Amino acid sequence: FPYTTLFRSLLAESMSKYMQDKFRFLGVRGATRTEIYKKYFPDARKTKTIDWDFVESCWNKEEREFQYVVVYYLKAMQKFLKREDISRLKYLIVTKSWWDTVDLLAKVVGSLVIRIEGYDQIMLEWSKDSNIWLKRVAILYQLSLKEKVDKQVLERILVNNLGDSEFFINKAIGWALRDYSKFNPEWVREFIEKNKNGMANLSIRE
């Protein structure tokens, strides 16, 4: 990817500050990245195979834009994920973790989980993990699934995380409920009424 020719120091500094200086950036704007993805990813889809060496190479680079390449590449290639790839996705979630990559990886994980029978149990396990990012993915993986949302699994995952003081967990709980309320508002109202004493104010406001 021709990122190194697009270095912009001032923009890179601004992007890094936005991410609380957790990562170094090259300074490639989102619109520019999107144009690059549009150029390269259609050919990648023709292979019908995920290039995990490419994923690893990009993920191991220091600059954050390369991790963005990975998550958008996997989003473009998600229908080619295999059941054993869940362990690879887990690795990406727990390394170089922050909301900017994790939230996109949640969608990729969701595309795999809904295809593989029994993988909802993995999400239940993740929802009780000590790693906050695995828990966040478990909470968010059913976003936008509408009638395909497994209400029982969603409820168990949310209940597993009630009482957590972590901002990113409580924010995710509210996000998941708000999203599902667009399709099933009555269920969401009942859930909040039943569990409001254990819910963070942030989750309810969200």
Where are these regions (language model features)?
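Alpha-helical scaffold domains
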Residues: 1-206
